[in-house]
A protein has these predicted regions:
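Bacterial Sec-dependent N-terminal signal peptides
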Residues: 1-21
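Thiol-based oxidoreductase modules, predominantly thioredoxin-like and allied folds used
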Residues: 21-24, 63-105
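Short active-site neighborhood of thiol/selenol oxidoreductases, capturing the structured segment around
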Residues: 37-51, 76
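Solvent-exposed coil/turn segments that connect beta secondary-structure elements
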Residues: 48, 81-82, 131, 143
Length: 185
């Protein structure tokens, strides 16, 4: 019995040590933080019904390397693309006038901010620069190493030199991921 308790304690300690959380904030909080310490913003646009969004949360955003890198170099925003939050951003108010509370956990109307960025699929990760200017949408599920490419691309401003699809393809082919893929299942 003692061995089982020790083994269980060790397993739980290992899970706790390996667990890392991204410090999620609202878009408005990120804008306020920008004024004190400018960083790029990584905004996860998700929905409650989206399976790949849940997988992104579980497998990628819970990854220790991803969480550490994001927390160090970005403000991370979680935004429900079909939610009913009212957002003040870029001297505008964004809401979801078509929101139906009865459909809160299923497909709902798109939020105005979602439409503002032209997001039509979930998950989509939107990157904004330190001046809150739109950099790019990254659509679909990405594992930690796939997301690493974009995190480092925008952090290092390498995207500014990639003016053609061929240049991006070369960057993609030569990129050497460093993040470890771990299972959180």
């Amino acid at each position: 019995m003692k061995k089982i308790v020790i083994l269980l304690t060790f397993c739980l300690a290992t899970v706790y040590i390996n667990a890392q959380e991204i410090n999620w904030v609202t878009l408005e909080e990120a804008v306020a933080l920008q004024k004190k310490n400018p960083k790029k913003i990584m905004m996860d646009v998700y929905t409650k019904w989206c399976g790949p969004c849940k997988r992104l949360d579980r497998d990628t955003f819970q990854n220790k390397d991803v969480a550490n890198y994001v927390n160090q170099h970005y403000y991370a925003v979680k935004f429900n693309g079909e939610g009913n939050d009212e957002i003040s951003f870029k001297e505008r108010k964004f809401s979801n006038p078509g929101y139906n509370p009865a459909k809160a956990n299923s497909r709902n109307s798109a939020h105005e901010l979602t439409r503002f960025y032209g997001i039509r699929s979930y998950p989509t990760i939107v990157f904004l620069d330190e001046n809150l200017e739109f950099l790019a949408p990254i659509r679909g599920y990405k594992n930690p190493q796939q997301l690493e490419l974009y995190l480092k691309l925008f952090k290092k401003n390498d995207h500014k030199q990639l003016t053609t699809q061929e240049a991006f393809n070369d960057y993609y082919e030569t990129f050497k991921p460093e993040f470890k893929i771990t299972s959180n299942k």
